[in-house]
């Protein structure tokens, strides 16, 4: 039997795994553009590191992203605001033509978000995320692979 080893914080212990989804404003299908999708993925990785949010799975469809994240000590609104704000600002700075063409100077993400607390059905939700049009497995492993590739190990 696997030993439960919850995440430890300065004043709390535990995990808060959420199936999370953000949709682009006006449901524009910007993630069909490979460069935009890959840049957004890298921005999410940066945000996860910056805010110490663990991500097990992430998958993009044409106009939205799904992810399995542990919120740690953050509330749902805090996590959504941080992740959406970080990725939107940097992505629209990098691609000003997308901002002008699709979002008319407004933000990247729809103000709404979806977060569902995942317990026993984590495997089902991970499977669902992996069935997205563009999905990636195990963000931690991706970081390791990037490190190995960069260092030539």
For the regions a language model picked out, list residue spans one by one:
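Basic nucleic-acid-binding interfaces
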Residues: 1-153
């Amino acid at each position: 039997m696997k030993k439960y080893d919850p995440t430890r914080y300065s004043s709390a212990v535990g995990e808060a795994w959420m199936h999370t989804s953000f949709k682009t404003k006006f449901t524009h299908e910007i993630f069909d553009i490979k460069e935009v999708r890959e840049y957004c993925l890298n921005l999410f990785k940066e945000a996860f590191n910056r805010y110490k949010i663990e991500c097990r799975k992430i998958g993009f469809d044409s106009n939205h992203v799904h992810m399995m994240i542990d919120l740690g000590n953050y509330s749902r609104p805090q996590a959504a605001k941080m992740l959406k704000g970080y990725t939107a600002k940097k992505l629209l700075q990098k691609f000003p033509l997308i901002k002008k063409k699709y979002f008319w100077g407004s933000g990247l993400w729809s103000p709404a978000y979806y977060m569902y607390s995942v317990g026993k059905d984590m495997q089902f939700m991970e499977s669902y995320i992996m069935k997205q049009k563009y999905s990636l497995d195990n963000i931690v492993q991706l970081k390791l692979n990037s490190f190995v590739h960069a260092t030539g190990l």
